[in-house]
Amino acid sequence: MNYDFHSLLQLPLFLGMGRSELADIEQEVSIGSTHTKRGAILASENEACTALVLVAKGTVLASTRSDDHSYEIVETLQAPLLIQPEHIFGIKQRYTATFKASTYCEVIRIEKQMVLKLMEMSMTFRLNLMNIIATQSQRYSRRLWHQMNENIEKRIVRFIKDRCIYPAGQKQLRTKMTVLARELGCSRLEISEALHRLEEKQLLIVKRTIIEIPMLQLL
């Protein structure tokens, strides 16, 4: 079904857009929305990115896996959420994570042809999209240059933060301690001791093959 155009003004891609500009867009561009149930897949890893997918309401689980599938990070993300807009253009136009509805979600989908039309018609839309993609690119470009700390606890924290889509909120790292030890260049015992020190500080919860972080911004 078609989305209420006036509600778009509250969403990141349309912030700052005047009502007259929105009225012109409404006549030329078709923007559809759907209501999804809990568990519905909104985008899958390696699926072609052929549209901008914007979650207007609800909560989403984003799962990102290593190339060898030896570890996975699951993030709880809140609306409004634009799902990997940087992948609609460029060399690799495929999603690198799987996004699943954790609650009832209202999802807006703008097909690539309509995205190009919006960019042509509206400078506000064009600047908003460019700013979102540029901010994401700048955040990613700094990750490889963070200094590797000798402290194992800080290494674990950096490992998790560098692999998250959003730098705050609830996260899960699903892996074995032996894998984490291999990735960080230390022993399994050192990893185990460091994790339990972080758990004693109530910064995370250690379970079998799962490390839960209630609030990443506190790490």
Language-model features: locations:
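Cyclic-nucleotide recognition modules
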Residues: 29, 73-131
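Polybasic "coupling" helices that flank or enter modular domains
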Residues: 102, 120-185
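Glycine- and acidic-residue-biased ligand/ion/polar-headgroup-sensing regions
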Residues: 50-63, 79-80
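Short phosphate-coordinating micro-motif centered on Lys-Gly-acidic
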Residues: 41-47
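Phosphate-/nucleic-acid-contacting segments
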Residues: 161-219
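Cyclic nucleotide-binding regulatory module and flanking cytosolic helices
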Residues: 1-38, 82-83, 87-90
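Cytochrome P450 core scaffold surrounding the K-helix E-X-X-R motif
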Residues: 63-69
